[in-house]
Amino acid sequence: MSNSASIAALVLVSVTSLAVGAFGLRLSRTMSDFYVASRGVGPVLNASAISGEYLSAASFLGVAGLVLARGVDMLWLPVGWTAGYLLLLVFVAAPLRRSGAYTLPDFAQLRLESVVVRRISSLLVVAIGLLYLIPQFQGAGLTLRTLTGAPSWVGQLAVAAVVGLNVLPGGMRSVTLIQAFHYWLKLVALLTPLFFLLGAVGARSGNPQTGAVLVADWVEPLRGEHALYLTYSLVLATFFGTMGLPHVVVRFYTNRDGQAARRATMVVLVLLSAFYLLPVAYGVLGRYVASDLVAAGRADSVVLELPSRVFDGPLAEGLTALLAAGAFAAFLSTSTGLVVSVAGVLSQDLLGWGAGHRQGIRAFRLSTVVVVLVSLLLTVVSAGVPVAHAVELTFAVAASTFCPMLLLGIWWRGLTSVGAVAGMMVGGGLSMGAVLTTTFGIATGGWFGVVMIQPAAVSVPLSFATMVGASLATRSRRPEHVSRTMVRLHAPEDVHLNRGSFHPERRETGAARMGAGAAEQGSGGGELGSGPMHRPTGTAYGSKTATEGAAGRDGTDGAVRRSGTTARRS
C-alpha cells in the first residue's frame, strides 16, 4: 500500500497549523498575549482549545491500544480523564481565574506568601511538563514508523520542529487558535473512518479473531493479581491528576472571569465525552479484526492499522491518511500547550523578565527552545516505556503534588507553606520514584512493585494527609493575608470589595505598565492586581514596597488608582 496519502496528510496538518499560528501572531503584541492571551478568550473557543490540548497521544492512540490489549478494565481511563474536569468545574476553575495568577507557581506564592513554595512549584511544573512531553514525541515516532517505516526519531523531530515554530512567534494567542482547530480535526479524523469500519465489520459473519488474547480474559473485569488496587490507583491518578497538569490549569487564566471559566469547563465536559466514545470503539473493533497486534507488541498502532485490515485500495489509504492527520494533530496540540506552560515558568523563575516586555518575550522564546530540546533527549532515554503508561505516571505525579495544594489552598485557610512543601515533597517523591523505576526498568517484586506500577492510591492520600498534618503542626506559619486572599479567590467579580493587591516589585517602563492595565481592565476580571503583567517575586505579598510603584495606573474602562496596599475603583 502506498503511504503517499498519509505523508501528504501529515504535511498538510503541519502547514495548516503553522498558518493558523501565523494568524495568531498578528494578535500577539504584549507579554499578556504571549502568556494568557490577554485573558480575553471566550468560553466556547477556550473549551475547544482546552479539549484539543488535553486529547493527547494517549487519548488518540493509547486508549484504543489499551482496550485492545487489556480489555474492559481500561475503560476507566477515558472516564477518569473526563471526570477530572468535573472536579475542576466544581472546585477550582473560578477561584483559580480570580487569583489573577499567570501560572501554578504564581498561585502558590499568592496563596502561601512563600518564595520557597514558588520555587518548588516551578520545579514540579517543569518536571511534569517534560514527563508529559515524552509520550507525545513517542506517539509521533510511532505514527511515522507505522506509516512509512522511518526511524522513530524522524517523527519526533518533525513534531518538535512544528511545535517550536508554532509557539515561538505568537505564544498563547497562536496556541489557542491552533488547539481549537486541532480538537475538531481530531474528532472528524476518528469519527469519519469509524462509520466505514462499523459498516464493514457489521456485515461480516463468523467469530472474531482471537490471536494471542482470549475473549473470556478480555471481557472479564478485575482479572489478575492486585487488580482492584491497580484499578483504584488508575482512577485516582486520572481523576485528581487533571487539575494538577500545568498546561491544563494555565488555560483557565485565559478566561475573562470566573463565570467564563466555569462555562468553558462545562463545554469541555461535553466535548471530551463525545470524543472518548470513539477510541474505545476502535479498541473493540481492533479486538474483533486485529487482535494479533497484541502478540506483536503493536497494540498502540491499532487505530492506524484498522483501515488496512478491513479495506483495500484507495479507501484504505484515504481513511489511514485521515487518521494519521488526527494523530499528528494530537501530538502537536498537547505538545504546544505543554511547551507554553513550561516555558512560561522557566522564563519567569529561571531566566527573569529583564527591564520590559521585550525582554520577557525574549526569555519566553529562549525557554521554548530549551524545553523542546530537553524533552527530545528524555524521549530517547525512555524509549521502552509504553505511551499510555507514561501518561498514567504523569497524572500520578500531578495528582500527588499540585492537586492537594490547589484544593487545600483554595478551600482551607489553614494550609501553611510548611504543609504545602511537605505534602508536595512526600507525594512527589513517591510518584517520581515510580517514574524512575519504570523508566529504567528496575525490577521490583511484591506490593512495593505494584505501588511502583501505579503509585496514586498511596501517594495521593499520603500527600493530602501530610499537608494537613504539617499545617496543623505549624499554625503559627499561617499566611498573614490569608483572609484577604480567600476573599479574592471566592468573591464574584461583580462584587466590589477590597480584594487586596498582588503587585510585587517590577522593573518595567511606564508604557509597559499602562499596557498591562489596559489588558487587565479589558479582561473583566473586576479585581485589582490580577493583571497578567504582575509577576510575584521575593517581595512580601501585600507590602507597601510591592504596591507603591503601581499607583496611578489608568486602564481602558476607567481610572484605577492605588495607594499603599488598598485599591479603589472610581
Model-inferred region functions:
Residues 491-570:
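Long, low-complexity, intrinsically disordered cytosolic termini of multi-pass membrane proteins
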Residues 1-510, 567-570:
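Membrane-embedded helix-loop-helix hairpins and adjacent transmembrane boundary segments
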